[in-house]
Amino acid sequence: MSLDIFLTNNLTNKKEKFIPQDKTNVRMYVCGPTVYDDPHIGNARPVVVFDILFKILKNEYPNVTYVRNITDIDDKIIKSSKENNISILDLTNKITQSFNEDCIYLNCEKPNHEPKATEHISEMIQMISELIKKGFAYENKKHVYFEVKKFKDYGKLSNKKLDELVAGSRIEVSNNKKNPEDFVLWNPSDTDEPSWDSPWGKGRPGWH
């Protein structure tokens, strides 16, 4: 017998009945780990929570596609690589393997797809270019920033207003920004750091 599924909608802060856009192919995307250090209990929580949801959905719908990304390029990864005298590739492969082993130990199923960030740099560059074209982002000194004020619904999911954001807390302060709350989409890389060619010079994606 089919059962109704209720999930908390962050936008309304209410429990609402789950109605998929396509009952023949339910899709879920989950933000995965940044693989710079050994997995900890904070990494395990979303794995378990969304594994439960995945299994419930599979019980109710014929096809469920579960995607969970791996962030394998990041400032923390570069820092850890240098501190431990290990290549970024060896470090990220080691931590990814450790993470997947922990998932097995927790009896969590593998997602259908587990894309690595570095496998999709070209798509990120295309998306950033489109944001610049539409006026939502800007380039300055080989950095590209998202201009938060241009997006009127920014903070809607977290119920925070733009003027409540404090520069210098979780927001990186930089003279390259138009506004303190703007966040980086593309960073220039130092000569000893991984980099990809882009319209703004060699660099790597930024995370928010």
Located regions from the model:
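NTP-dependent nucleotidyl-transfer catalytic core
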Residues: M1-W207
